[in-house]
Amino acid sequence: MTAADWRRTLNPQEQREVRELVGAATEFDAVAPVGEQVLRELGHDRTEHLLIRGSVSGGAADAVVGYLNLTPPRDAQPQMAELVVHPRARRRGIGSALARAALAKTGAANRFWAHGTLEPARATAAALGLSPVRELMQMRRSLRDLPDSVPAVPGVRIRTYAGPADDAELLRVNNAAFAYHPEQGGWTDVELAERRAEPWFDPAGLFLAFGDDDSDRPGRLLGFHWTKVHLDQPGLGEVYVVGVDPCAQGRGLGQALTAVGIEWLARRLGAGDSAADPTVMLYVEADNVAAVRTYQRLGFTTYSVDTAYAVPPAAN
């Protein structure tokens, strides 16, 4: 096993190896070990990359067996680390070595995502003295037997994304709705452009709600629902982002937008086909009680939980 090697950039071969590593872990654990943003960052120098090379049992003698991605500090938010170890290179201390290297680099100020909160991640966190500081719930429901009608919101019209002319308002509402959020807040044209470039992006699945009853700012954007169809998982759609302008909250707009998007996903994924069994998923902060209750009313139940771990403040 090689020593941990920090990089600002990865060459194309290393990027392929990391993607193969993530794919192997996803297949073995039935949950992706890192978020989609980590994969998006592989070709950029905006985050730091940590590689460990070694042998894979029954396979290559010099492969990337461990990888960690570390975000830079941003707006007083702690740095976030996400890591993965090859299934056939586990129980060698690779995960602990990656985590210790990140803690040493940040002065123990970073957090670690444990996607799916699997037992090996819990054990590693406990061994390193880390405690849960954040939980992100994945909720799911069948796209069959949806409510017959979408709740209407007076004075609001909903249409789909019409192109870059909508971007300024979309960014305004997103950043107002998620001002507190470490991943979703603070978006710029760069974040929008990257997501439009994703193969799953479909403007017909991005719904915008405009207000028609505001005399000062007629037609302003009040909220949006961005859906996603998982091309690598047939039959799976996602409530990717639902954002409502804080000035428009309390009107049922979030529930209405969610319902509109879910209906579209049901049609898109063939819920009317007796042979199909499509599902919709979403992520929500576990402590966002209002949002969790809204999704429960729409028929969602908890599927899995991602946990962020960190050194307890008293020990930091």
Swiss-Prot record:
Residues recorded as binding 1D-myo-inositol 2-(L-cysteinylamino)-2-deoxy-alpha-D-glucopyranoside, renumbered to this chain, are 36, 183, 228, 238, 283
Checking InterPro entries in the record gives: Acyl_CoA_acyltransferase, GNAT_dom, MshD_Acetyltransferase, Mycothiol_AcTrfase
The highest taxon in the source lineage is: Bacteria
Q: What Pfam families does this protein map onto?
A: Acetyltransf_1
Q: Does the keyword Lyase apply?
A: no
State the similarity comment. Answer: Belongs to the acetyltransferase family. MshD subfamily.
Instruction: State the protein's name.
Output: Mycothiol acetyltransferase
Q: What is the lineage of its organism?
A: Bacteria, Bacillati, Actinomycetota, Actinomycetes, Mycobacteriales
